[in-house]
Amino acid sequence: MNFEGVRILVVGDVMLDRYVSGQVRRISPEAPVPVVSVDKTWSVPGGAANVARNLARLGVETSLTGLVGEDETARDLEQAVEREGVCGVFVASPDRRTTRKTRILSQGQQLLRQDEEEIRPPSPEEMDALRQKIAALLPGQDAVILSDYDKGTLRRSVDGTSLCGHVLREAGHLGIPVLADPKGADWERYAGAQCVTPNSAEFAAACGRDPHVLLESGERESLAAQLRARHRFGRILLTRGARGMALFGEDTPWYCRATAREVADVSGAGDTVIAVLAACVGRGLDWNDSAR
């Protein structure tokens, strides 16, 4: 499918994913841990920036905004998104640390992950700066994605204001659909979104259910209807891992079975789902066809 001419804005928690790959040939004499002889290191956009990366690789004209620090990780992230053809317009703060996740790999398997991050909501000054960036980027977009990794950008500010609510209102005035990849229990901040794309654990948590207990289809559909009514969602696209996906809207629920594949690292699967869905919606497909 050709997405040339489609324009999408991604707003959310940007981060840098760093990878360290090598061989394990011995155990450390200092502690019972493997010693990795490093062969290669590389960095790619992560979090909301990975959503933008997916969109750009589909051929979508992609813009991205979020909070970063004034640090080396932010500079590396800016270069990484630029290499991907994404227009990154960040709000940098000297009091904030840019999120970086480092994954240690050997033979395609992840041995360890190291997170460097500072999780807090935007200050009033950061919120104002984000609103200004969004005001400049929003006109002419075909869709907006709220990519929430619960790192702070989309949390309510210390004065109670919500960036999600601002984006939803401004996009609504322009007739631009908003899709949200939710985190946490406060789904009210996404109220009015045309679509939310939780995984099974996120869906269960939002419904007050045990995420480790598999829901029956009838119960799942009832809970989805309650969430849609409570938060005025147009629809919910539930990603269910190896069990596929389910789309809940005004029509009969639609289920899609997954094709089984062996995957060593499943990180970023939800990013791909919302990127493809938004690209299809931005191109003009209806929601059912976009989900397919």
Locations of the language-model features?
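Conserved phosphate/ATP/ADP-binding segment of small-molecule kinases
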Residues: K151-G152, R156-P253
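A short, aliphatic-rich alpha-helical micro-motif
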Residues: F3, L138-P139, W187-A191
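Active-site metal-binding loops of divalent metal-dependent hydrolases
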Residues: D13-V14, Y149, T272
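Generic enzyme active-site microenvironment
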Residues: I8-V11, I145-L146, L179, T197
